[in-house]
């Protein structure tokens, strides 16, 4: 039986002591971790990856996240992701991020993020022209 797609994952509890604190965000085999800061009102992604899969962990801010499974020709779905949220993007899933606030996040990828490798695996789309996406962004402007 095929596993159902899971978008959002739980982050571990914060452990505190006199030295400070620690929190497990994610276990896994990753080829890269990118730290990204995006300004309110900006758009990132707007593409899909042929093979790469990645997790996003939001340190601070909010992302209005749009996603659609290309293999199943599914409808576009929307989810508001907030501080401390962890979510997954599989290969072949169109995705776009609209930042409703200034946002600081980490992207954990299964493939190398050299520009050459990244561009070779990437297919650009134009999700901001989808009617549902336009309507959702308009509500946040």
What does each of the following model-derived ranges do?
Residues 12-46:
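A short glycine-rich, His/Asp/Glu-containing loop-to-beta-strand
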Residues 71, 100-141:
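Double-stranded beta-helix
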Residues 22, 46, 65-66, 89, ...:
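Short beta-strand His + acidic residue motifs that chelate non-heme Fe in jelly-roll/DSBH
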Residues 1-17:
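N-terminal leader/capping segments at the start of a protein or of a new domain
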Residues 51-69:
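Glycine- and acidic-residue-biased ligand/ion/polar-headgroup-sensing regions
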Residues 38-41, 83-84, 90-92, 102:
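Tight coil/turn sites that cap or link beta-strands
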